[in-house]
């Protein structure tokens, strides 16, 4: 039985979830997760920076901002062929989704034809496509949707109340407008935030409430842990407590039960035990590879070793091209479902009352 979808969460309700005893919160999140997903599958995505550095925005966490001296080498927009080759390599390593990010305030008209061609060619590989290019007009969103872009990433970063402490060059309403343009164009939304930027527990609750109360939940919700980069204003920010981060994952899972909750930036600084707790709390998506745009990420082989230890497998994006393939795929799905049913029959759901 899938969990009901709500869009009317009060801040007090969300704060009450954060305040639950840790074990109770994780139990509730895990039950919600199992009702909506295979608990042992994790979506694997790869992220490529297609244009690096010299961004005019002043996001205090970002090494790509032109406002700070972080030593980052600027790069122009990559050639389409190079992007496609990177996507092929990612697919060979097990990625089912390929995400492309550009350090822009918004895409310029002269760059759009190249960006659209990237989408078309990566899509032709049988991969899901995602982009993050900054703010979008309604027309730009329609162009991307027409090229076949599946997802558009545009994070809210933090609560509306704390937002001005982190970014001043674009408003919270600017971000919400881009999200609406993406939705109106028919694309799926990838939207989350960054934890550990000095925000309060109430700010974390407010961010998740904002996401859960959107007209449609984001299909992907990246929960990032701040990566402190030398030269940015947040380089000396105090670390977030790991339990507070795991709580954020768990509450996101409960509020948005059918969304992929992505364990995103910051994994390089998490040990295996913390990552395992995040998966238990409902995270079921990761970025895979050695870099997230410009910050380190666990090596792909380390991820697969962790998956093996935990009995986790990558989520597959199946594309059957013949009746035989379709029949084989359906047979595998039925077998997996039967196995899951047998496993569930060995346990009882303590959340159900007689």
UniProtKB/Swiss-Prot annotation:
Record key words, sorted: 2Fe-2S, 4Fe-4S, Biotin biosynthesis, Iron, Iron-sulfur, Metal-binding, S-adenosyl-L-methionine, Transferase
PROSITE patterns, sorted: RADICAL_SAM (PS51918)
Cofactor dependence: [4Fe-4S] cluster; [2Fe-2S] cluster
Top-level class of the enzyme under EC nomenclature: transferase
Domain of life (superkingdom): Bacteria
Enzyme Commission number, as recorded: 2.8.1.6
Residues holding [4Fe-4S] cluster: 55, 59, 62
Cysteines joined through disulfide linkages: none
GO terms, molecular function: 2 iron, 2 sulfur cluster binding; 4 iron, 4 sulfur cluster binding; biotin synthase activity; iron ion binding
Radical SAM core domain segment(s): 40-258
PANTHER family xrefs: BIOTIN SYNTHASE, BIOTIN SYNTHASE, MITOCHONDRIAL
Subunit structure: Homodimer.
Known function: Catalyzes the conversion of dethiobiotin (DTB) to biotin by the insertion of a sulfur atom into dethiobiotin via a radical-based mechanism.
Family: Belongs to the radical SAM superfamily. Biotin synthase family.
Protein name (Swiss-Prot/TrEMBL): Biotin synthase
Origin organism lineage: Bacteria, Pseudomonadati, Pseudomonadota, Gammaproteobacteria, Oceanospirillales
């Amino acid at each position: 039985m899938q969990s009901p979808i709500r869009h009317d969460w009060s801040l007090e309700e969300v704060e009450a979830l954060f305040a639950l005893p840790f074990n109770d919160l994780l139990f509730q999140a895990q039950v919600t997760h199992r009702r909506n997903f295979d608990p042992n599958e994790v979506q694997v995505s790869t992220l490529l920076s297609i244009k690096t550095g010299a961004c005019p925005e002043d996001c205090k966490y970002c090494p790509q901002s032109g406002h700070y001296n972080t030593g980052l080498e600027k790069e122009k927009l990559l050639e389409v062929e190079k992007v496609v080759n990177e996507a092929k390599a990612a697919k060979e390593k097990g990625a089912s989704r390929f995400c492309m990010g550009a350090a822009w305030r918004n895409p310029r008209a002269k760059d759009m034809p190249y960006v659209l061609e990237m989408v078309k060619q990566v899509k032709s590989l049988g991969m899901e496509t995602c982009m993050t290019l900054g703010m979008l007009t309604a027309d730009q969103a329609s162009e991307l949707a027409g090229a076949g872009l599946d997802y558009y990433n545009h994070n809210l970063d933090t609560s509306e109340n704390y937002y001005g402490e982190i970014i001043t060059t674009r408003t919270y309403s600017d971000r919400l407008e881009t999200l609406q343009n993406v939705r109106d164009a028919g694309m799926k939304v990838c939207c989350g935030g960054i934890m550990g930027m000095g925000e309060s527990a109430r700010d974390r609750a407010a961010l998740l409430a904002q996401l859960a109360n959107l007209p449609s939940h984001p299909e992907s919700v990246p929960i990032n842990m701040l990566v402190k980069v030398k030269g940015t204003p947040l380089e000396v920010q105090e670390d977030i407590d790991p339990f507070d981060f795991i709580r954020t994952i768990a509450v996101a899972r409960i509020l948005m039960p059918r969304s992929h909750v992505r364990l995103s930036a910051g994994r390089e600084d998490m040990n295996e035990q913390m990552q395992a707790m995040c998966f238990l709390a409902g995270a079921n998506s990761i970025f895979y590879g050695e870099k997230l745009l410009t910050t380190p990420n666990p090596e792909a082989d380390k991820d697969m070793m962790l998956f093996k230890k935990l009995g986790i497998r990558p989520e597959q994006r199946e594309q059957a091209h013949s009746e035989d393939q379709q029949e084989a795929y359906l047979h595998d799905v039925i077998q997996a479902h039967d196995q899951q049913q047998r496993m569930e029959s060995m346990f009882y759901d303590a959340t159900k009352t007689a």
